[in-house]
Swiss-Prot record:
Its EC number is 1.1.1.17. It catalyses: D-mannitol 1-phosphate + NAD(+) = beta-D-fructose 6-phosphate + NADH + H(+). This is Mannitol-1-phosphate 5-dehydrogenase. Belongs to the mannitol dehydrogenase family. The lineage of its organism: Bacteria, Bacillati, Mycoplasmatota, Mycoplasmoidales, Mycoplasmoidaceae. GO terms for cellular component: cytosol. NAD(+) binds at V6, L7, H8, F9, G10, A11, G12, N13, I14, G15, R16, G17. It comes from the Bacteria. InterPro entries: 6-PGluconate_DH-like_C_sf, 6PGD_dom2, Mannitol_1_phos_5_DH, Mannitol_DH_C, Mannitol_DH_N, NAD(P)-bd_dom_sf. The keyword Thylakoid does not apply. It holds the Pfam family Mannitol_dh_C. GO terms for biological process: mannitol catabolic process.
Length: 364
């Protein structure tokens, strides 16, 4: 039987730790594309690596793949043209860099595109970026929920440390992939994951960073932090149930509680700084914090906690994060009109944030 050809862009934690193990489990023919030459060299040399699971005493050997450098354009286009599945885990903001390859590739058969990225309907957004005329390419939206941190203590450069726990949902497409659950509609799964995983995770990172705590699990060991996150989670669940009657409240409560247990796992050693980068993206209207704000506003849920989160986002100053530095510069320049636009908050709520930021400047 002919093997399914898959081409995956991105040899980072999600690519190596989650996506390739799934493809290997399905006995797919795997081609992995990566831009970092050092990573490519090591993968081509060692031809295997281990995935170590941090929520159980298990590991998995991944050794059935070929590796290519993204700069090898002719070869990548050849692989794209014969692929049954093309997938990504390179970061949503980097997808536009693949446009040239997609423009040059001639798709003579049906190809499925799966973007395993954080965010709202990223595959659909990618389709809009590419504007392909070829109807052979089927863009399928995906939701992926697993924690794959930048683990510091590694015996082997290539090895990945992540959760074995993984939930992946995709809208229905004409290929069965073990490990990927297909649904007719993803809306509920997207919003549930965006708010009760991505948003809460980021909030913990913000709290920890402000308190000069290094890891997520350390942050949750502070009682006041756990209390704040639990209250926000309860508000989110109330809002989701009000907005989507098909949600079961007890199931959401269990889901939220389980996520906090996952985040509190000390073996994961998840850096708070990993979770709070790219603050401008996180304030986008298609992103986590605005989604919560909009839901709370519509369903008349108190805004004090989510506004506190907005304030933390704007005050977080990470020296090596471009977006964070951009916000810090605007605050120092008192560029309130531009900051108000970036926040997307309504005037009454923005004025509360502005007052707090002004106080911070005065203190300096």
């Amino acid at each position: 039987m002919k093997r399914i050809n898959v081409l995956h862009f991105g040899a980072g934690n999600i690519g190596r730790g989650v996506i390739l193990p799934i493809y290997q489990q399905n006995d797919f023919s795997i081609d992995l594309v990566e831009l970092n030459q050092n990573t490519v060299n090591e993968l081509q040399k060692q031809k295997q690596y281990q995935v170590h699971y941090l929520d159980c005493d298990q590991s998995q050997l991944v050794n059935d793949f070929n590796t290519w450098n993204l700069k090898d354009e002719a070869k990548i286009i050849e692989l794209m043209e014969r692929a049954d599945v093309i997938s990504t885990s390179i970061g949503a903001k980097n997808l536009a860099s693949l446009k040239t390859l997609f423009d040059k590739a001639k798709f003579h058969k049906r190809a499925i595109v799966l973007c395993f990225e954080n965010g709202f309907r990223i595959s659909s957004n990618f389709k809009n970026i590419l504007q392909l005329n070829n109807t052979q390419v089927n863009f399928v939206d995906v939701v992926i929920d697993t924690i794959a941190p930048n683990f510091e203590k590694k015996a082997n450069f290539l090895d990945i440390y992540c959760e074995k726990y993984s939930e992946i949902y995709a809208e229905t497409f004409p290929l069965e992939i073990k490990g990927v659950n297909q649904k007719n509609s993803l809306d509920r799964f997207i919003i549930k994951k965006l708010l009760l995983v991505n948003a809460l995770h980021s909030v913990i990172g913000l709290l920890g960073f402000q308190q000069k705590l290094k890891y997520v699990h350390e942050t949750l060991q502070v009682k006041s932090n756990l209390t704040f996150v639990e209250k926000l989670a309860q508000q989110i669940i109330d809002a989701l149930c009000a907005e989507y009657p098909e949600f079961n409240k007890n199931n959401l409560l269990s889901y939220g509680k389980n996520n906090l247990v996952r985040f509190a796992n000390p073996k994961i050693q998840d850096l708070n700084t990993r979770l709070i980068r790219e603050p401008l993206r996180k304030l986008n209207q298609n992103e986590r914090f605005y989604a919560i704000y909009k839901l709370f506003k519509k369903n008349k849920i108190a805004l004090n906690n989510i506004l506190q989160v907005y304030l933390m986002v704007l005050k977080t100053n990470i020296t090596d994060d471009t977006e964070s530095q951009q916000i810090a510069k605007l605050i120092n320049e008192k560029a309130w009109t531009e900051l108000a636009k970036l926040s997307s908050l309504e005037e009454s709520e923005w004025n509360l944030i502005k007052q707090e930021l002004s106080r911070e400047i005065t203190k300096k």
